[in-house]
């Protein structure tokens, strides 16, 4: 598999062939990783005023956070105002909606990123360019692009706009974020949502609602307006950490048989790669 783009929804016949993630109609992102995606608080949301809001995304009612002028969905996915404005409409469902044209994603890296995180970005870009059909290309004068910005000097989180929105988009990375979590955030950029929000997740996962922090349960809601490609993949780089948003240190997500699992922030699984390549054939 070489570099070629893809993003969002595909036909059920293709989905049956592909191993993979959860893709969802429209474009929005989220990312998590607090020293291993430990989402005890929303990415960089603990010290800033935030407002819980209700909205519509592809015809589905959702809960999101308004903070610093950004709309955070599922913790680390940033929705544009336009996406929310259009949200009451029926799901787009089209394969080209929110997909980067030709699978080409132009990017820049903020000057204050630092060499360590810059190297992590390079490693993550190499993973995408060598294993998926997307092409991450250094920007010259392109008007539609992504900028990697430096988030916090003490955290290990990140966030990103989801899918192709046009104009300048952002991927924010904290100082101690891992390469795997950079890949996770970039996954939102290409159009991937979180694996635990798939429509079929209850066949494979048991959400431990009693262990979730007060006011954070909405981050575990199923996003039924999305399109799932391939079988559920608990090892996906887009899965939440088992203790995400835990209020007591106990798991908030277990397997359906009530056993724990080890989450992946090492890199792509075969299912992740197949899903992205289904989006960007």
What residue ranges belong to the model's regions?
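Bacterial Sec-dependent N-terminal signal peptides
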Residues: 1-8, 15-16, 20-54
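Zinc-dependent metalloendopeptidases
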Residues: 33-281
């Amino acid at each position: 598999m070489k570099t070629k783009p893809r993003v969002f929804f595909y036909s059920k016949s293709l989905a049956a062939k592909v191993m993979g993630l959860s893709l969802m109609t429209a474009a929005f992102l989220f990312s998590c990783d607090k020293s291993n995606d430990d989402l005890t608080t929303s990415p960089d949301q603990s010290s800033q005023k935030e407002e819980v809001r209700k909205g519509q995304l592809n015809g589905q009612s959702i809960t999101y956070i308004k903070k610093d002028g950004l709309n955070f969905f599922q913790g680390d996915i940033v929705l544009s105002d336009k996406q929310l404005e259009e949200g009451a409409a029926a799901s787009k469902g089209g394969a080209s909606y929110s997909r980067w044209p030709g699978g080409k994603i132009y990017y820049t890296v903020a000057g204050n990123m630092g060499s360590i995180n810059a190297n992590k970005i390079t490693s993550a870009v190499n993973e995408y360019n060598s294993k998926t059909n997307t092409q991450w290309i250094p920007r010259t004068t392109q008007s539609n692009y992504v900028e990697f910005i430096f988030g916090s000097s003490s955290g290990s989180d990140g966030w990103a706009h989801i899918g192709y929105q046009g104009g300048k988009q952002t991927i924010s990375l904290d100082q101690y974020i891992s390469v795997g979590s950079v890949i996770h955030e970039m996954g939102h950029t290409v159009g991937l949502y979180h694996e635990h929000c798939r429509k079929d997740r209850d066949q494979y996962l048991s959400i431990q609602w009693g262990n979730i922090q007060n006011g954070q349960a909405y981050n575990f809601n199923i996003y039924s307006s999305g399109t799932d490609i391939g079988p559920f993949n608990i090892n996906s780089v887009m899965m939440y950490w088992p203790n995400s948003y835990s209020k007591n240190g106990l798991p908030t997500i277990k397997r359906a048989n009530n056993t724990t699992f080890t989450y992946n922030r090492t890199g792509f699984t075969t299912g992740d790669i197949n899903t992205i390549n289904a989006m960007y054939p």
